From Swiss-Prot:
Belongs to the gyrovirus apoptin family. InterPro entries: CAV_VP3. One of its GO terms (biological process) is symbiont-mediated perturbation of host exit from mitosis. Residues 1-28, 57-95 are annotated as: Disordered. This is Apoptin. Keywords: Apoptosis, Early protein, Host nucleus, Host-virus interaction, Inhibition of host mitotic exit by virus, Modulation of host cell cycle by virus. It comes from Chicken anemia virus (isolate Australia/CAU269-7/2000) (CAV).
Length: 121
């Protein structure tokens, strides 16, 4: 924002307070937080509150990590859809079909069958 936009009062739905100084006010009991939203910087002055580190959704560079939270936090906004997982069926009819196919493929006439377990998660 340039100086002309800061001095122009906004619409009637918001409260306009002229800036008191151009330098951020930071004392042990007062912090100023700047939040950037779509090219607009919002400045919040928080006085009489405790310090707390909060992780952000975006990773921050080492210089800005003090202001934006922890550095190298993954960006959670770009979640890729997970590929569909293969679910094994516990249907006895499907097990018999696969067992029959398996017996046709094998050439040994008498092979001992082992029990298979299907575990549902």
């Amino acid at each position: 924002m340039n100086a002309h936009q800061e001095d122009t009062p906004p619409g009637p739905s918001t409260v306009f307070r002229p800036p008191t100084s151009s330098r951020p006010l930071e004392t042990p009991h007062c912090r100023e937080i700047r939040i950037g939203i779509a090219g607009i910087t919002v400045t919040l002055s928080l006085c009489g509150c405790a310090n707390a580190r909060v992780p952000t959704l975006r990773s921050a560079t080492a210089d800005n990590s003090e202001n934006t939270g922890f550095k190298n936090v993954p960006d959670l906004r770009t979640d890729q859809p997970k590929p569909p997982s293969k679910k094994r069926s516990c249907d006895p009819s499907e097990y018999r079909v696969s067992e029959l196919k398996e017996s046709l493929i094998t050439t040994t006439p008498s092979r001992p069958r082992t029990a298979r377990r299907c575990i549902r998660l």
